[in-house]
A protein has these predicted regions:
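Short beta-strand->loop
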Residues: 90-101, 156-159, 192-210
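C-terminal motif of bacterial Sec signal peptides marking the signal peptidase cleavage site
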Residues: 3-7
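An extracytoplasmic/periplasmic, membrane-proximal ligand-sensing/linker region
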Residues: 18-21, 26-37, 209-213, 217-275
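Bacterial signal peptide processing site
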Residues: 9-12
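Alpha-to-beta junction loops
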Residues: 48, 66-75, 87-90, 126-128, ...
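Small-molecule pocket liners
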Residues: 105-109, 202, 212-218
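A ligand-binding cleft/hinge motif common to bilobed small-molecule-binding domains
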Residues: 77-88, 145-148, 174, 179-199
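Bilobed "Venus flytrap"/periplasmic-binding protein-like clamshell domains
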Residues: 15, 19-43, 55, 78, ...
Length: 275
C-alpha cells in the first residue's frame, strides 16, 4: 500500500520524529494537504519532527498502529475500536464540530435527488454505496440505519459496494450509479459547497443519531509526559486560521468508554474486524 508521507520541520535535533497516521476519508492527497498545517503546529509545540502517513485505505492505519509504525493517529470511532482490539492505545481528544457546537456529527443516507425513494425501508433490493468498510459514518452507521428499517446490509440489499471514501460515495449517488449511499453529513455539505458534487444532486432520506467525533489516538507505550504534551497541544490550539483549516472550533478530551456503543454495534454487524 502506497502512503503519502511528509515531514514537518522545526523539531529539535536528537528527538525521534512523531509519526502520525491519518485515515483517508477523502482522497489521500487532500487529507495530507488538510493536515500538513497541523503537523507543522505540532512540530513547533512539541519541539520535534512530525511525519504524516496517509495510506489509500483505512485498515492500513490500524495495521500501522498495531505494528508500532505510528505513534498518533486520527481514527474514526470504528477504526479506533478496531485498533484497540489489536494494540494498547488510548483516545486523547476529538474536535468540536462547528456545525453542531459539540463533539458529535451525523451520518446520512442519501439518494439521487430525482429518486422515487423517500424512506430507508424502501431500500430493500436497492444498490447501495458505502465508503470504506472501516468507516464509522460511511459503513457502520448506514448499516445501523438500514437495520433500524429492517434491512440487513448483508442479505437484503441488491448489490452493495465500498467506494473507499465519502467523496466517491457522494459522486456515485449523484450520478445515479447506485440507488443510495451512506456518508458523513458534514462532508456532504463540504462537497456541495466546494462544487465537488452539484448542490441538490442528492437528497437526504435519513440522519443517524449523533456520532462521537473522530478521536486522536496515541500508543500507550509513549511516555505519559509525551501523551499529555500531545493532548495539551490540541487543547491549546487558538489559531483561528488553523482551526478553520481543520474544520474545528477546538478540541475536547475523550475516553475509551465514549466509543463503547460503536464497538457493540460493530460486533453485531460483523464490522469489528478491519478488511
Amino acid at each position: 500500500m502506497i502512503a503519502v508521507a511528509g515531514g514537518c520541520g522545526g523539531g529539535a535535533s536528537g528527538e525521534e520524529a512523531l509519526r502520525i497516521g491519518l485515515i483517508p476519508n477523502q482522497a489521500p492527497d487532500e487529507v495530507e494537504a488538510e493536515y500538513q498545517p497541523l503537523g507543522d503546529y505540532l512540530s513547533e509545540e512539541l519541539g520535534r519532527e512530525v511525519e504524516l502517513f496517509v495510506p489509500t485505505g483505512y485498515p492500513a492505519v490500524v495495521e500501522a498502529m498495531a505494528n508500532d509504525e505510528i505513534d498518533l493517529a486520527l481514527f474514526g470511532g470504528l477504526t479506533y475500536v478496531q485498533a484497540r482490539e489489536r494494540a494498547e492505545v488510548s483516545p486523547l481528544v476529538t474536535d468540536i464540530n462547528p456545525r453542531t457546537g459539540d463533539t458529535t456529527y451525523r451520518s446520512v443516507i442519501v439518494v439521487p435527488s430525482d429518486s422515487d425513494i423517500q424512506a430507508v425501508d424502501e431500500l430493500e433490493g436497492a444498490d447501495f454505496a458505502f465508503g470504506s468498510v472501516s468507516s464509522t459514518s460511511g459503513s457502520l452507521y448506514p448499516s445501523i440505519m438500514l437495520a433500524g428499517a429492517g434491512i440487513d446490509y448483508r442479505t437484503d440489499l441488491g448489490e452493495f459496494t465500498y467506494t473507499g471514501g465519502h467523496d466517491a460515495t457522494a459522486a456515485a449517488v449523484a450520478s445515479g450509479n447506485v440507488d443510495a449511499g451512506g456518508l458523513e453529513y458534514r462532508i456532504l455539505l463540504d462537497l456541495e459547497e466546494e462544487g465537488t458534487i452539484e448542490p441538490g444532486s442528492v437528497r437526504v432520506i435519513e440522519r443517524s443519531a449523533p456520532v462521537e467525533g473522530y478521536p486522536w489516538v496515541v500508543r500507550d507505550a509513549l511516555p505519559e509526559e509525551t501523551r499529555d504534551e500531545i493532548a495539551d497541544a490540541f487543547l491549546n490550539i487558538d489559531d483561528e486560521e488553523l482551526l478553520s483549516l481543520l474544520n474545528a472550533d477546538g478540541y475536547e478530551r475523550v475516553e475509551a468508554a465514549d466509543y463503547d456503543y460503536v464497538e457493540e454495534q460493530a460486533r453485531q454487524l460483523d464490522l469489528l474486524t478491519e478488511s
